[in-house]
Amino acid sequence: MKFAYAARDREVAFIIRLLTIFGVVEQRQMRLLFDHLSNRSYGQILARLRREGLAFFSPDGQFLATSRYSLDHGKTLESVMVFWAFIKMRDNVLDFCASDPPAILSFSSAAKDYDLISGSKQNIPAINAARTVVAEAIVRLIVVDDLSTLDEVEPRLVNDYGVLVGPNGVERIYKM
């Protein structure tokens, strides 16, 4: 099912839900995710969220967040990287929710369940510790901006993938 179809007429709720889970994303990412909206409709939604105190914009206008604190918590890069992976997978998403650490978000597709996990250096110990706790049927998508980071991850026998993200989105997905 196309994400645009699933989100139609519920864009405000989807944006609030996504911002609550991720904390902070780039404005261009959110615009790309909701590219089915006209510029006017999208602008009206953001203006409404800002007016109601549900969205905050960084001073340079690059980031969209749930609060000023979200911009300062130091995990902006992790959130942005994982959001690129969510955008890549959007048309496979049937439902999504916040996940238990080390994952940021879990989503279901028609065939499988997925965890989107930031592969930052600080998160590697938690990823390795959780490898035996997470069910084998769940696909772990470990999002990194440098392939060498994946060398530190202890992969499970099945269903572990590395997602390489660049400044403009997902560049490649690797089976681990």
What are these regions (language model features)?
Residues 5, 20, 35:
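Short, charged/polar micro-motifs that form catalytic or ligand-binding hotspots
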Residues 115-171:
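Catalytic cores of nucleic-acid endonucleases
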Residues 36-51:
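Short amphipathic alpha-helical interaction segments
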Residues 10, 14-21, 26, 54-129:
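Nucleic-acid-binding surface
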Residues 26-35:
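A short acidic, leucine-rich amphipathic alpha-helix
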Residues 1-10, 14-17, 153-176:
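Non-catalytic C-terminal interaction segments of nucleic acid-processing enzymes
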